[in-house]
């Protein structure tokens, strides 16, 4: 997700997303601004500071969130049961968790706090201008010079923006298309754009005639959260997600090649008993 104020700098090497790797040997002595206060923002801030950069961590919130309700979902029941909930129940769970904001891990905050990083809270970047080879971030009373800006601003949901999915995006069923307008609340725009997935992470086609082809594409990433929970975007649940994906693929491969497997069954002739076990029985 690229905040609007940074959009005109798309492709500029002075701005990158927190999901991109940092070239640590190029950070020493540089001014780095990290936007956001989620875990990835803190991790990037710490890595940059440890590489010798002067780091400013900027957040819109006036205080850091202290609670991570997502930790309450780290159970086998949630991992296996969330996909079985009704659509409205799934939406209610994730609405509440995100509305409460998710605190970065305690050890991550402790790591950042020890590195002399400047924390600027209650500040929203409303203008970005160039200052020589650097950028000047205007956040009201705060003016932050930066050689590199790292956006820890999360991800947006837009399959059409991905080259690999661009030709398929218009055929993919979204959550907006599965729920009536009355089910949605203000602020649900992002949830509406999530793809509505099948039980094995497969895309579901708007047109049933395209399902066989579209169902071959598995969406094993953050976009699966609303349909299947945290099976593809949360470390504690990753093993559950991998198993679900593997089982779904194995089942689909078998069904697709049923004729081959059935013929193999008909041809199977490996004897279990060779005749010497109890000769009078044969």
Placement of each model-derived feature along the sequence:
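Flavin (primarily FAD) cofactor-binding/catalytic cores of flavoenzymes
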Residues: 1-39, 43-282
